[in-house]
Regions:
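Sec/Tat signal peptide C-region and signal peptidase I cleavage site
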Residues: 14-18
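C-terminal cap of metal-dependent C-N hydrolases
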Residues: 28, 353-407
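Bacterial N-terminal signal peptides
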Residues: 3-13
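Histidine-rich, glycine-flanked metal-binding segment
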Residues: 20-23, 30-76
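Divalent metal-dependent hydrolysis catalytic cores, especially in the metallo-beta-lactamase
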Residues: 101-129, 136-155, 177-192, 208-212, ...
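Active-site core of metal-dependent hydrolases
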Residues: 183-305
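Metal-associated gating/positioning segment near the N- to mid-region
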Residues: 63-134
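His/Asp/Glu-enriched, well-ordered alpha-helical/loop segment
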Residues: 280-363
């Protein structure tokens, strides 16, 4: 009798157990640098959050089970340098045709979070939020430009107007959008001074935010001086591998001031872009142990159609230079999430939002180019297989979550 009752109990328990999770990803290799996980684990999702991380979770414990054997499961990738304020302005990143939509360039590439890097200043930010940020499936944050007009023309004329740095107006917009604005951006300042950087730092101090600096390619002021005397701990210097900034010492190793800046907490971001990544700097810096703090794309029309392509491709370049895979993942998830003040992102932890990238690492002979046509050969390439945003599968390259159409009893609509 007891055996019969036990069998009845177990039979009744199975349906409840099967509904415990919405989705379980099984047999993947989890890389979560923040929580020191680098091992095969099963990951379960319920109600948009990570619900369990175990060596083994039964397939019938979830409404849907997906086998990702041979693949890597990482936090959703975080790209902190993009330009996505699309609009009708000609030759403009801010509300213009040089920006690209976030979702088509983020979601198919394992990216769940982006930060627009100063496309908008305070004047256009309400429109930017209403039309772009609030209507993207990708999670979007923003660095707001110190220039009120933002990046409104390709020749950077607007960004030279020191009279368009209204800290009161800027701070008002930041206060109204503090859930979205994660920092201040200054870029392309061509004058022989650091007015824009100093104003951005002043705004950062006033609003308790970091500054992202695009130093440019100008020889009329000292990058070393800016890094040593103006930037604060937590501030971000993007385009770290763009020449001709003097990052290397006479011995071909990272300059001492770069090492000192890192010790002080200055962050160095890739910001690949269409013209801001050279192997002539990246290789000697990386070979001598100076890895970037964060890997980002500087996504825009020119970079997406050039040698940058997408974030996994930039990650693959850093991998080809000798940075270990786990560190490349750290620089694409945990580190950038922390740099923008959202350390809760960029991790695989029970209770955290289920933003996940499932990645394949192909092995073979691959070539990677920089902006000058320089090439580095690599033996690995990172390929996105799945993207999960807040528990929902939003990209599935090989249809792992689909069913054979003849067997699925699918309802095909007709018109």
């Amino acid at each position: 009798m007891l055996r019969i009752l036990a069998a009845i109990f177990l039979a009744c328990a199975i349906p409840a157990h099967a509904q415990q999770y919405d989705l379980v990803l099984r047999n993947g290799h989890v890389i979560d640098p923040k929580n020191n996980i680098d091992a095969q684990r099963d990951v379960a999702i319920r109600d948009g959050k990570i619900a369990a991380i175990e060596p083994s979770i039964p397939a019938n414990a979830a409404k849907q089970s997906v086998d990702i054997s041979g693949l890597y499961l990482t936090p959703g990738l975080v790209d902190i340098h993009v330009h996505i304020f699309t609009g009708l302005r000609h030759n403009a990143w801010g509300n213009g045709d040089l920006s690209v939509p976030a979702d088509p360039f983020a979601i198919p590439n394992g990216v769940t979070t982006v930060a627009d890097a100063g496309s908008s200043g305070w004047r256009d930010f309400p429109e930017f939020r209403r039309r772009i940020i609030d209507n993207s499936r990708t999670r979007v944050f923003a660095f707001i430009n110190i220039i009120g007009s933002g990046m409104v023309n390709e020749d950077d004329v607007a960004e030279q107007n020191e009279h368009d740095m209204d800290l009161d107006a800027l701070s008002k917009i930041i206060e109204q959008n503090k859930d979205i604005i994660v920092g201040i951006k200054t870029a392309h300042w061509q004058q022989p001074n650091f007015i824009s950087v100093k104003k951005a730092v002043e705004a950062g101090n006033r609003n308790h935010l970091p500054v992202m600096v695009d130093f440019g390619w100008f020889d009329n002021k000292s990058y070393k001086e800016m890094v040593e005397t103006i930037l604060r701990p937590g501030d971000i210097s993007t385009h770290v591998f763009r020449m001709p900034a003097p990052l290397l010492g006479p011995d071909g190793k990272p300059a001492p001031y770069m090492l000192d800046a890192r010790k002080r907490g200055i962050k160095f971001d890739v910001g690949h872009g269409g013209g801001s990544f050279t192997f002539a700097l990246a290789e000697p810096m990386v070979k001598n142990g100076f890895f970037p703090d964060s890997i980002s794309t500087d996504l825009h029309v020119g970079s997406a159609t050039g040698v940058m392509l997408n974030l996994p491709n930039v990650m693959s370049k850093i991998l080809a230079l000798g940075v270990p895979l786990a560190e490349v993942i750290r620089e694409s998830t945990t580190n950038p999430a922390t740099e923008i003040g959202h350390p809760e992102l960029g991790q695989i932890a029970v209770g955290s939002v289920a933003d996940i990238a499932v990645l394949r690492v192909d092995h073979g002979n691959f070539g990677y180019a920089d902006l000058a046509g320089g090439k580095v050969n690599g033996t690995e390439r990172i390929v996105p297989e799945m993207t999960i945003r807040a528990g929902r599968v939003v990209f599935d390259l090989n249809a792992r979550t689909a069913v054979p159409w003849r067997e699925g009893h699918l309802k095909y609509a007709t018109r």
